[in-house]
Amino acid sequence: MKSTCYMIGILLMILQNTYQSPVPETDANSRSVKAARNEAVDDSEQLKEVKRHSQGTFTSDYSKYLDSRRAQDFVQWLMNTKRSGELSRRNADYERHAEGTFTSDVTQQLDEKAAKEFIDWLINGGPSKEIISRRNAEFERHAEGTYTNDVTEYLEEKAAKEFIEWLIKGKPKKIRYSRHAEGTFTNDMTNYLEEKAAKEFVGWLIKGRPKRNFSEVHSVEEMDRRHADGSFTNDINKVLDIIAAQEFLDWVINTQETERDLLEEQ
């Protein structure tokens, strides 16, 4: 009996060992399977990351994260600055600068200030009415050309007077006909008149322009029209031609006897 019990115990021990030995193997197998699965998951995650980088989705997600973070920071900044009331004023200033109303208001303010200062200057000690009227008259005369016409008329009248005085006082009595035929007499007369007119104009500028009343002769509009048409210069030329013709006839009459004496002597 003892041997039988001993044999049964040995068999039970063997059976127990056979049942207990596969258990560790299954645990190891399960662990290896889990490790393999984890490695496979890690590999798949890495493949997904690589794929996301290649497709740009990872960068997009990162950009979205940064945008959301900036939005949160901006909202927080708005909440902080809104309490102080500076946001509304700054936005209003920015809108005014963008629309140009700020610059317009500054310009309007400067214009109003300049107008006020100008009015104060006129009230306190501005230029007198006589100075303003004289300046306006001078500007109008320069713009219309009457000032230049007066200078031209003065020079022409002065030249005519000097030419008449020269003919009366200093007319040469022994002049050859050849000078009139060659034109040298006319050239000398022109040079003399130009020199005399230049001298008189310089003296007129130094001493001061004489005052003349044009209402007795012609109106300003008529004088401008005559200068523009050239009729005034034509009248002066006619007067000079008539005077020259008269003087030439007198010269011919006075020198006729002298020429006859010369011919008889020859």
UniProtKB/Swiss-Prot annotation:
Coiled coil residues, start to end: none
Propeptide feature: residues: 21-50, 84-95, 136-140, 175-178, 213-224, 261-266
Keywords annotated in UniProt: Cleavage on pair of basic residues, Hormone, Secreted, Signal
Subcellular location: Secreted
Keyword presence, Secreted: yes
GO biological processes: adenylate cyclase-modulating G protein-coupled receptor signaling pathway; negative regulation of apoptotic process; positive regulation of insulin secretion involved in cellular response to glucose stimulus; protein kinase A signaling
Position of the signal peptide: 1-20
GO cellular component terms attached to this protein's record: extracellular space
GO molecular function, a single term: hormone activity
Residue spans crossing the bilayer: none
Primary location recorded for the protein, binned into one broad class: secreted
One Pfam family of this chain: Hormone_2
Biased composition (Polar residues): 23-32
Residues covered by region (Disordered): 23-44
Function: Promotes hydrolysis of glycogen and lipids, and raises the blood sugar level.
PANTHER family: GLUCAGON, PRO-GLUCAGON
Family, per entry: Belongs to the glucagon family.
Name listed for the protein in its UniProt record: Glucagon-1
Underlying gene: gcg1
